[in-house]
Amino acid sequence: MEYLYEKLTAYGNSDYYAFHMPGHKRNMELMRARLPYNIDITEIDGFDDLHHAEGLLRELQENAAKVFHAEETHYLVNGSTVGLLSAVMGCTERGGRILMARNCHKSVYNAVYMNELRPVYIYPEFSEETDLNGEIHVDQIKKLLKEYEDIQAVVIVSPTYEGVVSDIEAIAEIVHGYKIPLIVDEAHGAHFGFHSYFPQNANTRGADVVIHSLHKTLPSLTQTALLHINGRYADRERIRNYLHMLQSSSPSYILMASIDECVRAMDECREEIMDTYVECLQQARERLKQLRNIKLIEAEHYDRSKIVLSVKNLKNTDGEVLNGKRFQEMLRSYHLEMEMASGSYVIAMTGPGDTQEGMDRLVQAVMEIDKNILCEELSGKDEDHTIKNISYEMIPLEQAYSSFEAGRMEGESVKWNEASGRISLEYVYLYPPGIPMIVPGERITSTIVQKMVKYKEMGFSIEGLSQENCLLVAGNPE
């Protein structure tokens, strides 16, 4: 079988001269940066066209489908974002209704806006003990599908940013009873199915459309992803059409070569790669379970590649109440950069590229920090500074208008403390993970404003706002 990276390398070393894009012309002496100009080409003879794949790229995508246990697979060079946009818009009619998990990524909300959809939200259960939003239960979906008979598709996130996994097989069975597709955002689970230590790939559990971000948990360059289609309920032709419209018309051959090499590694070397990784990960997790105060969070249905460490209700020996942001800063002093900090925890994202040395550094740093922590009941004064009441729980808000309707309304900017009761005309995200706290068209509550204020005070990044410390709301108070 021919592989893209090898073919690009051979072409780059040949005497073919480029009278075509890109403008660097593979001239390695032109620029000081040692970037891979030599293999950066456009759609020339012999290298196929991603938007009309008939040769090499068609064969490679078919091989990716085989490796990831899908019926049909597409390379994505615009990340999972373009896959989610294409899947949602391809599986729904304009103005239709969609059932979606409230913790979906913002790209799903953008698809809802672009297709003028009417969303029905499924709110994941929230754990007071861990401050994690949990799985989506099949009973929730069953109830809402029965209540809203015009739902055209269901979208859920599994695993979540924190690694929580839902029962895809049971959910798919219910959804298919209504002859509609189940779209699974498995962006954080591209490694699923390649080792028994991790959950199964959603392609094997009945999902109709699955999106994998290769770059998140497998050895591939940033922005690389896959979209898989299975079964008979997803409209394949419409999904393909949206991919052609929304994905770059100049797909990077460097990124596609990265996808090819990643798929090839998972096909030919998965046991060697994954066994080494899992052994290293298991050892780290076992050592972290011995912590006295900091807690390694685990759940019943969980992706163990995510190391979630909680400092909930903890103080250091100086009496400082800890939170996820402060814990992240402490780890940064050890030159360890976490994936994300939330109210009471941090996430250390692991993958096959991790080394024993890297894992040892993490464990040693956390153990040292743990020695300088007190585990005691926080006083009322302490609770003014803790995140107990501002954990990232999905708070239901009234949908006064659709996001599309809100996007066409006249608005005004008001201070946060003046926004309660008004209709928001913009998104409010805590980033990461990029899940909206407020969606355009929703009525703002004092509770959500309080959460925003406290997160801001603690140094978290609140995004989506057109003006700092203000919210764009509908012009006429209701």
Region locations from a protein language model:
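Short, glycine-/Ser/Thr-/acidic-enriched flexible segments
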Residues: 26, 161, 216-217, 232-234, ...
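Conserved N-terminal alpha-helix of the aminotransferase class I/II PLP-enzyme fold
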Residues: 36-79
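N-terminal glycine-rich, Lys/His-bearing helix-loop that initiates the first secondary-structure elements
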Residues: 1-38, 429, 433-436, 465-466, ...
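Short glycine-rich or small-residue beta-strand-to-loop segments that form or flank ligand, phosphate
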Residues: 74-76, 154-157, 346-351
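Short, compositionally biased
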Residues: 116, 121, 457-468
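Conserved PLP-enzyme active-site core in the AAT-like
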Residues: 4-9, 31, 67-70, 80-298, ...
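Conserved C-terminal alpha-helix-loop-beta "cap" of PLP-dependent enzymes
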Residues: 286-447, 451-464
